[in-house]
Amino acid sequence: MFLLTAHVVFATITGNNEDVADIVTEKLEDLGCQVTETEISQTDAAEFQQANICVVCAYTYDEGSLPDEGLDFYEDLQALDLHGKTFGVAGSGDTFYGEFYNTTVDHFEAAFKLTGAQQGATSVKINLEPDQAAIDELDDFASQLVAHAQAKR
């Protein structure tokens, strides 16, 4: 049987997006994937070329800004050719920011689409720390990513 590989990249200030990444990683592993989880400033976007499933879990800073430590990653991601890959984006934010709530999720989704990768699950936006409902949503997100990647095999 073919082993799916996944790479989960996160950016966090409060720890919430690392929690999001950990939840996704754990579910992917439970589903039989070989998973690498890394922090965005320590990751070269080109590492996604080695994975079947590519995931970003990142925060939105202030009024809609991408994480400073993830700007190079974001720019490099857009230049990659990820045809044949499955991607997903999730993030924790704060609804206090209104129209800017979790906009980084939207930016990374758009960046992935430029690479030719296929979206394997609807992006997930979590308010603050993941509660049980959010964990269930993230588990479903991970399951959808695996199902999408398996269907492409």
Model-derived features: positions:
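FMN-binding flavodoxin-like domain, especially the glycine-rich phosphate-binding loop
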Residues: N16-D19, K27-L31, Q50-R153
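Short, flexible active-site loop motifs that bind/organize anionic cofactors or intermediates
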Residues: H7, T38, L128
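A short beta-strand-loop structural module common to alpha/beta enzyme folds
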Residues: Q34-T43
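N-terminal beta1-alpha1 ligand-phosphate binding loop
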Residues: T5-V24
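Short, surface-exposed acidic/glycine-rich loop or hinge patches that mediate macromolecular interfaces
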Residues: A11-G15, Q42, T60
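N-terminal amphipathic/basic-hydrophobic helices that include classical n-h-c signal peptides
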Residues: M1-F2
